[in-house]
Amino acid sequence: MVTTLRQTDPDFEQKFAAFLSGKREVSEDVDRAVREIVDRVRREGDSALLDYSRRFDRIDLEKTGIAVTEAEIDAAFDAAPASTVEALKLARDRIEKHHARQLPKDDRYTDALGVELGSRWTAIEAVGLYVPGGTASYPSSVLMNAMPAKVAGVDRIVMVVPAPDGNLNPLVLVAARLAGVSEIYRVGGAQAIAALAYGTETIRPVAKIVGPGNAYVAAAKRIVFGTVGIDMIAGPSEVLIVADKDNNPDWIAADLLAQAEHDTAAQSILMTNDEAFAHAVEEAVERQLHTLARTETASASWRDFGAVILVKDFEDAIPLANRIAAEHLEIAVADAEAFVPRIRNAGSIFIGGYTPEVIGDYVGGCNHVLPTARSARFSSGLSVLDYMKRTSLLKLGSEQLRALGPAAIEIARAEGLDAHAQSVAIRLNL
């Protein structure tokens, strides 16, 4: 039975707080094993990759090679349905156009004292994109991670993807070429993260690593952080749908299940002010569950982590939605636009009944790599800015140094940093 929380219940706040703090995935204690893998790849390079690939992915990289060849990518295009390739091209183009609008501008100005200040944006030189293998090997994720890097001007985009039993998803290779990925390597797991961070004989190191993965990949990203940058540690997917009774229950149910089929730990939440509508949506979910290829996964997700929150009024939904800070927030109420300015915490907002979150997953243009597990309270989805860095600029002449120098000397001496003070004083003959 799906969890139901009623705002009218006297213990609602207690139950809601417990709901927010509930864990949806068990954190495996893999740090020791991962550290051993990372250290070995750092020491042994390619030979460690070959050994781990034999053990974990049952593939002999000495025969296949670590790098994916252009011929293999050509073959992937030949194997891919033309209609799917065209759909991926549409998605790529829309992602590119939207992310191009995020490009920041350099700024340089002269203040009233004649001091020149500014900031300059430059792209990271090389980034690594981790793509999971198996059922989570999605070409859309390749586009979402690689296209902002391309727009930002990253020179070298490196993709690593495991090849269990030697198999690679051809659509992942197609998406990589469409997005301008520079190099592809058939390695996965913590060993791939280590290779990207420290380099091997075959794989040159990068400056930042992005992309989702399992507990081993997440642990490896945490371990190498500092040597390289990372994007985020993503958790299971989630959606919050705020909907009134004028919606078609089947539509809302389909949107809830679109998240539930991702993962048994995914979470789908309906928030409404109408109990009869909530029941209709629950019934629609049960009907649709049996039509899905991933029925077992979606059923477990909905059973274990699905929720219906009944509010007295949609005015009450806004602070609750901000506390949930969902990865995806659908607003399907009469005046959806009026809600948007009042939402502070959400990874991405989907406005109105004709904007299912799935469009954002694929072809909307906005990025689908978003903060999960309430981290939208303090972080944002992937963007062009994740592949760029800002450098401050400052220029003084002798007059400006004379104007500002004495104050700098005073602060330096107050902090007990004599060399700091002398650095300015020596120029002013003080």
From Swiss-Prot:
Cofactor(s) listed: Zn(2+)
Cofactor remark: Binds 1 zinc ion per subunit.
A GO biological-process term: L-histidine biosynthetic process
Pathway annotation from the record: Amino-acid biosynthesis; L-histidine biosynthesis; L-histidine from 5-phospho-alpha-D-ribose 1-diphosphate: step 9/9
Residues of the active site: E327, H328
UniProt keyword Cell inner membrane present: no
Top-level taxon: Bacteria
Binding annotation for NAD(+): Y130, Q191, N214
Classification via InterPro entries: Ald_DH/histidinol_DH, Histidinol_DH_CS, Histidinol_DH_monofunct, Hstdl_DH
Similarity field: Belongs to the histidinol dehydrogenase family.
PANTHER family, sorted: HISTIDINE BIOSYNTHESIS TRIFUNCTIONAL PROTEIN, HISTIDINOL DEHYDROGENASE HDH
Entry-linked NCBIfam families: hisD
Protein known as: Histidinol dehydrogenase
Organism: Brucella suis biovar 1 (strain 1330)
